[in-house]
Amino acid sequence: MVRKGRKKRKIRVLKRVAFWGIIVFISCTGMYFYREYKDIQLENIVSHTTENEGIEGRLQKMSNYDFRIKDIVENKSQYPEELLELLTTNIETIDFVLNYPEKKNNSPAETVGETRSGEIPLLLQWDERWGYQNYGDSMLAVNGCGPTALSMVIVGLTENKQATPYQVAQYAEKNGYYVEGVGSSWNMMTDVGSYFGIQGSEIPLGKDSIQTELELGHPIICAMRPGDFTTTGHFIVLIGMKDGKICVHDPNSKKRSEKLWNYETLESQINNLWSFTTLF
């Protein structure tokens, strides 16, 4: 009788554990799909809205799917217009924009932090460690793709972790490589790197030339036309090859940096490109 009682209690306990396990699984799965649904809706708004709707109209739509955006909308007077516009074109920047009032006066980071030796790190122009800092007539988060791309290459090739996007941007701007109303000059790619110990050389656009440079361990910075990466102009870094496709570090997007890209997809979007090596 004692054994039967213990067995029944054990079965009841196992049933409870199984029941709550199922509840937790369903809850977690539901939350995952809900987050996926929200992200899809936000991406659809970003992809299908027009300039005629205005920044406020787009934010109002987006606020229906994320409480953080709703908070930004309710306190929009605390945010520069360029940051609000950034949010309407890149939902990855939600937390960066949200934290602006609290962190806008923080000093920029002195280093990029931990990196892996021999690898080109992914750095983002809207990283809170430097993204709120001024660059030209805006912020690094908004128009700092050039300095951030160069910073990735410098840190990866030289392991100089103090060559942050902010430090590269400061040097570039002081030496005339920021063009007001346009952004980073292409000359930055061949001229600025030498100060930080790297050399940039313009190379021809071609599948073979890109593959050869990457196989030699030479990262490539590309100036991009409107397309998958930008609606205006942008810089990205090609860091290597995998399964016949190109690995990209996009200073404005973690998601695009996680993808592998066919050369044919990138070819028509590349406006110019530079390969980089160390000077020493």
Predicted regions and their residues:
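Short, Lys/Arg-enriched, disordered terminal segments
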Residues: 1-15, 280
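Active-site-adjacent structural segments surrounding the nucleophilic cysteine of cysteine proteases
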Residues: 2-3, 13, 20, 27-174
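Conserved active-site-adjacent core of cysteine acyl-enzyme catalytic domains
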Residues: 30-66, 70-73, 110-111, 118, ...
